[in-house]
UniProtKB/Swiss-Prot annotation:
One of its GO terms (biological process) is regulation of transcription by RNA polymerase II. This is Gastrula zinc finger protein XlCGF16.1. Belongs to the krueppel C2H2-type zinc-finger protein family. A zinc finger (C2H2-type) spans 6-28, 34-56, 62-84, 90-112. The keyword Chloroplast does not apply. It comes from Xenopus laevis. It is found in: Nucleus. GO terms for molecular function: DNA-binding transcription factor activity, RNA polymerase II-specific; RNA polymerase II cis-regulatory region sequence-specific DNA binding; zinc ion binding. Disulfide bonds: none annotated. The keyword Transcription applies.
């Protein structure tokens, strides 16, 4: 397939979408045009601001179809869903043990 790849000239990361590439470039320029009206924290993209504002509002629009638990971010729901499926896709290359989240794998790495 003829997939266009966008290359960052600063750090050489590669992106398949132009929007992801443009958002990434702001990490190098320091541009943070989106500001939280409550705490004035700044963000590179609008979607990050929206997710952050849910901390202040308490809104949790993403609910688990298995148990009904609600989350403020879709990524948190996706991580939670693994507790129901048993999926463990993060592998420790040192010992072969698998984990459901990158953070659990990172914590495990400290034991080696």
């Amino acid at each position: 397939p003829n997939t266009v790849i966008y290359n960052c000239s600063e750090c050489h990361k590669r992106f398949r979408s132009k929007s992801g590439f443009v958002k990434h470039q702001k990490t190098h320029t320091g541009e943070t045009p989106f500001v939280c009206f409550v705490c004035e924290q700044r963000f590179v993209c609008h979607s990050a601001l929206i997710g952050h504002q849910r901390i202040h509002t308490g809104e949790k629009p993403f609910s688990c179809t298995e148990c009904g638990k609600c989350f403020s971010r879709r990524s948190h729901l996706n991580s939670h869903h693994k507790t129901h499926t048993g999926e463990k896709s993060f592998l420790c290359f040192a010992c072969g043990k698998c984990f459901a989240s990158r953070s659990h794998l990172t914590a495990h790495h400290r034991t080696h």
